[in-house]
Amino acid sequence: MTSPDSPDDIPEQFRIRQAKRERLLAEGREPYPVKVDRTHTLAELRQAYPDLEPDTKTGLKVGVAGRVIFARNSGKLCFATLQEGDGAQLQVMISFAEVGQESLDAWKADVDLGDIVFVHGEVISSRRGELSVLADSWQIVSKALRPLPVAHKELNEETRVRQRYVDLIVRPEARTIARQRIAVVRAVRSALERRGFLEVETPMLQTLAGGAAARPFVTHSNALDADLYLRIAPELFLKRCVVGGFDRVFELNRNFRNEGADSTHSPEFAMLETYQAYGTYDDSATVTRELIQEVADEAIGTRQVPLADGTEYDLDGEWQSLQMYPSLSEALGEEITPATPAEKLWQIADRLGVEIPRDRGYGHGKLVEELWEFTVGDTLWAPTFVRDFPVETTPLTRPHRSIEGVTEKWDLYVRKFELATGYSELIDPIIQRERFEAQARAAAAGDDEAMALDEDFLAALEYGMPPTTGTGMGIDRLLMALTGLSIRETVLFPIVRRHSN
């Protein structure tokens, strides 16, 4: 049985293992059979026999299968540890007395670490009290041509991300994170359904890119002879559902944005959007906090998130809120209002060294947000609702009911990153058209994140939409908030640059 000493040994390991595969085929022994008679999972046996006395025979014959992650071969008795997908492990014993010399020699010659094998035999406990299957026969189920990483060397992040399948095999934490994500998604759906929300599906391919300020991925439909866009948000279609009479709807699905990738951003990401008729952004902020806390309880088991530095992050209790313009004014030491000219904001940005592209037609609203992010956003550690945004950067949001020049929008910040956003939705079709036209002018001036004018959406609003609040929350970022991990660790298969080979 072979095991790699270093990554440099892999080509030789591959050659040796491939030769074993060819020999098995030549001998008429299938290294990749279509089926084996597995009767129990390893976890089931662990559960059925939690505390057998040492050197006990149960008389139960079983068939088990798993990946060989440890092996020790001696004269007439070989030991191996099998592992199955959920991480459960069990010892198997290959004995000369039970299988004979030919089968014992074949085990020693044919089986490598990483192979998946089937073992049939009796459930026993060894002399040391280890629950085991004493084989009376065995079979290779899948011959591994590549060796597993060396057990005592930790996988680096690049390998974990590029070869998540290896990460899942060797690292229990990777399997835990994958299961936590599934549990989080299930808990989100459950919490919304308890509140009467209906899950719907809306188009991934759209004829217009709308619903968010972001650069889209563009593709071409040969059948329609037209460009289509991978959606950047489902918002405009979900609002059509509200117009049609679905008072509480949500969608949990993929969005795509042709932008940067870093520790908090991914070009492809899972997004939750909700819309609730007859609610305001105050209502959706409350629902969002309750939702996150309920999901933490159900899927993670705690509202205190352990961080890499050994501290904890508390998601419990009420969360603070602040307003964008007053908090920016306080950080700068001078008053900034919706009437502050863009020229002054550019001067402040230059003075502070804030890098803002000058060729994208940014006006007052975008400059305020960039300055706020630089001076305030990067300091927000505790869960915080940031409220009341500039009009021109929130074209789908209702004007504030009492503050001139801002909209009823909040962003939720957790540990310095934006986790969710919520609006009191703009439902006046005339004002919405004016906002879209302003976005079109921004696009013409070079803003590649400006929204397109969607005539069909405007037509829907013209039929009448009830007062509505909407929210959006990235599931990947929710996992970050609940686990303390980076976005690439919370995504099972994140996008990575291809190797040249």
UniProtKB/Swiss-Prot annotation:
Its EC number is 6.1.1.6. GO terms for molecular function: ATP binding; lysine-tRNA ligase activity; magnesium ion binding; tRNA binding. Mg(2+) 2 binds at residue 418. GO terms for biological process: lysyl-tRNA aminoacylation. One of its GO terms (cellular component) is cytosol. InterPro entries: Aa-tRNA-synt_II, aa-tRNA-synth_II, aa-tRNA-synth_II/BPL/LPL, Lys-tRNA-ligase_II, Lys-tRNA-ligase_II_N, Lys-tRNA-synth_II_C, NA-bd_OB-fold, NA-bd_OB_tRNA. Mg(2+) 1 binds at residues 411, 418. PROSITE patterns: AA_TRNA_LIGASE_II (PS50862). Keywords: Aminoacyl-tRNA synthetase, ATP-binding, Cytoplasm, Ligase, Magnesium, Metal-binding, Nucleotide-binding, Protein biosynthesis. It is found in: Cytoplasm. Gene3D superfamilies: Bira Bifunctional Protein, Domain 2, Nucleic acid-binding proteins. Its main location: cytoplasm. Its cofactor is Mg(2+). Binds 3 Mg(2+) ions per subunit. It catalyses: tRNA(Lys) + L-lysine + ATP = L-lysyl-tRNA(Lys) + AMP + diphosphate. It holds the Pfam family tRNA_anti-codon. PANTHER family: LYSINE--TRNA LIGASE, CHLOROPLASTIC_MITOCHONDRIAL, LYSYL-TRNA SYNTHETASE. Belongs to the class-II aminoacyl-tRNA synthetase family. Homodimer. This is Lysine--tRNA ligase. The lineage of its organism: Bacteria, Bacillati, Actinomycetota, Actinomycetes, Mycobacteriales. The gene is lysS.
